[in-house]
C-alpha cells in the first residue's frame, strides 16, 4: 500500500511561542502554545485563503498551555456542542465552549467553570475527551495529574430536564472516580487515551502503561516496561487506541531514539514494533521508528494507518497490518508559504531548518474544504518552528 500526502495549507509563526498540542473536530483545528493562547483555525477555507485570516485566538493562562483536546457533538434537539479542554504549565485544567455569532460568524470563547475548589488544587497534565455516540451515555473526560493519578469525569451539558420540555444549558462535570498509579513511589503520568471499547490507557515516565476499565475504573493489566526491558526505553510520549479500540500504539524513548510498540487490547499482548533500518553505532539494525523521540501518534479513521510525529522533523506513516512504513514527510522551515513567517532559527540561534514535530492529528474525510476533501484523508501537525501545517492524501477512495 502506497500513499502520498501533499501540503494544502500552512501558517508560520502561528503562535508567539512553541506550539505543544493540536486537536481537531469537524468545524475547527485547535492549537495551544507556551504563549498562553488557544487558537481556533477554521477548517473550511477557500482556495488560496490564508489560514490566519480565519483564525481566532483567546488568552488563557500566563504560564502557557501544553495539552488541548476538543469535543464536538450534536445533542438532543440539534443542540451543537463544541468544548475545548486545555492544561496549563501551572497545572490548571481549563474549559471553553466555542460558538459563533449568528451574523458575523466570529468565534466566541465562553469560559466554563467545571471544577470545584478542591479539584482545582490538583496539578493536571495530559487530558482526553471520550465522545459517546449513545445519547443515553455521558461523554467522558480523562486527565492525569503529576502524581500519577488518572481522573475520570462524566460530562452533563444540561440541567435535569426530566420535567421540562426545553433544554437548559448548564454544563457540569461529575467525578466518576480515579485510577491510582500502579507504582510506589508514584510516577509522572505523561499521557492518556480512552477507547471506544471502554478502556483507559495511562502512560508514565518510567516506561509503564496501565490499562483500566472505564465502566468500573478497575485496573486490568500493566505493561511493566516490557518494551523497556527489550529496548532500554524510558518515558512514554504518547498512547493511542485505534478507532475500533482493538489496538494500542505506544510511543516511547530508547535513549535518543523513538520507538513505537503495538499491543492488542483484549489480553494486552505485544504484537510487534514499527521500525525503519538504522545504521547507528548505538543501535541494532531496525529497532527504531525515528532517529529522535516520537512525540505523538494518530490513527486514521479506519485504523489501517498510523502516523508518528518525530523530533527528527519527520512524519512517518505506517501500515498497521503489515507493520511496514508507507511513506515519510520531511518538515522544512522553507515549506512555509509566506516568507516573513518563516522561522529558521530559534531565540538561542539554533537552526530550525528541519523542525521537530510536537503533535499530529488525522482529520476525518470532509472536515477540511478544498478539492477532494470529501474523499481524501487529511491531517494537521504543529512543529518546533511555531508552524501549523495541513496535508491531505493525494487520491483517496
From Swiss-Prot:
Pfam family of the protein (one): WD40
Cytoplasm among keywords: yes
Record flagged with keyword Nucleus: yes
Subcellular localization: Cytoplasm; Nucleus; Chromosome
Key words, A-Z: Antiviral defense, Chromosome, Cytoplasm, Meiosis, Nucleus, Repeat, WD repeat
GO annotation, biological process: defense response to virus; mRNA catabolic process; nuclear-transcribed mRNA catabolic process; nuclear-transcribed mRNA catabolic process, 3'-5' exonucleolytic nonsense-mediated decay; nuclear-transcribed mRNA catabolic process, non-stop decay; protein-containing complex assembly; protein-DNA complex assembly; reciprocal meiotic recombination
GO cellular component: cytoplasm; nuclear chromosome; nucleus; Ski complex
Disulfide bonds: none
Function: Involved in double-strand break (DSB) formation during meiotic recombination through stabilization of SPO11 association with meiotic chromosome and helping SPO11 to recruit other DSB proteins like REC102 and REC104 to meiotic chromosomes. Also a component of the SKI complex involved in 3'-mRNA degradation pathway. Represses dsRNA virus propagation by specifically blocking translation of viral mRNAs, perhaps recognizing the absence of CAP or poly(A). Essential for controlling the propagation of M double-stranded RNA (dsRNA) and thus for preventing virus-induced cytopathology.
Protein name in the entry: Antiviral protein SKI8
Organism of provenance: Saccharomyces cerevisiae (strain ATCC 204508 / S288c) (Baker's yeast)
Amino acid at each position: 500500500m502506497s500513499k502520498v500526502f501533499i501540503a494544502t495549507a500552512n501558517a508560520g509563526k502561528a503562535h508567539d511561542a512553541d506550539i505543544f498540542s493540536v486537536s481537531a473536530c469537524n468545524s475547527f483545528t485547535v492549537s495551544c502554545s507556551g504563549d498562553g493562547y488557544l487558537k481556533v483555525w477554521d477548517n473550511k477555507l477557500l482556495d488560496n485563503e490564508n489560514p490566519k485570516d480565519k483564525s481566532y485566538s483567546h488568552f488563557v493562562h500566563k504560564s502557557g498551555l501544553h495539552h488541548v483536546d476538543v469535543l464536538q457533538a450534536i445533542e438532543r434537539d440539534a443542540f451543537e456542542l463544541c468544548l475545548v479542554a486545555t492544561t496549563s504549565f501551572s497545572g490548571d485544567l481549563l474549559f471553553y465552549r466555542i460558538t459563533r455569532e449568528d451574523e458575523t460568524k466570529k468565534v466566541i470563547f465562553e469560559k466554563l467553570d467545571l471544577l470545584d475548589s478542591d479539584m482545582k488544587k490538583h496539578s493536571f497534565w495530559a487530558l482526553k475527551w471520550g465522545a459517546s455516540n449513545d445519547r443515553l451515555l455521558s461523554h467522558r473526560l480523562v486527565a492525569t495529574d503529576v502524581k500519577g493519578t488518572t481522573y475520570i469525569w462524566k460530562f452533563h451539558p444540561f440541567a435535569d430536564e426530566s420535567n421540562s420540555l426545553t433544554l437548559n444549558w448548564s454544563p457540569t462535570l461529575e467525578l466518576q472516580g480515579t485510577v491510582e498509579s500502579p507504582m510506589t513511589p508514584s510516577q509522572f503520568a505523561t499521557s492518556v487515551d480512552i477507547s471506544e471499547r471502554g478502556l483507559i490507557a495511562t502512560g508514565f515516565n518510567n516506561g509503564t502503561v496501565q490499562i483500566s476499565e472505564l465502566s468500573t475504573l478497575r485496573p486490568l493489566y500493566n505493561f511493566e516496561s516490557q518494551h523497556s526491558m527489550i529496548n532500554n526505553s524510558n518515558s512514554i510520549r504518547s498512547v493511542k487506541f485505534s478507532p475500533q479500540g482493538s489496538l494500542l500504539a505506544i510511543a516511547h524513548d530508547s535513549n535518543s531514539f523513538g520507538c513505537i510498540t503495538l499491543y492488542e487490547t483484549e489480553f494486552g499482548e505485544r504484537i510487534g514494533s514499527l521500525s525503519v533500518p538504522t545504521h547507528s553505532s548505538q543501535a541494532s539494525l531496525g529497532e527504531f521508528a525515528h532517529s529522535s523521540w516520537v512525540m505523538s501518534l494518530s490513527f486514521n479513521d479506519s485504523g489501517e494507518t498510523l502516523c508518528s510525529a518525530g523530533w527528527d522533523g519527520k512524519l512517518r506513516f505506517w501500515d498497521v497490518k503489515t507493520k511496514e512504513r508507507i511513506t515519510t514527510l520531511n518538515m522544512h522551515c522553507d515549506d512555509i508559504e509566506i516568507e516573513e513567517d518563516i522561522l529558521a532559527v530559534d531565540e538561542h540561534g539554533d537552526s530550525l531548518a528541519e523542525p521537530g514535530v510536537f503533535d499530529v492529528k488525522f482529520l476525518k474525510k470532509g472536515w477540511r474544504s478544498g478539492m477532494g476533501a470529501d474523499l481524501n484523508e487529511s491531517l494537521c501537525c504543529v512543529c518546533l518552528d511555531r508552524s501549523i501545517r495541513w496535508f491531505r492524501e493525494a487520491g483517496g477512495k
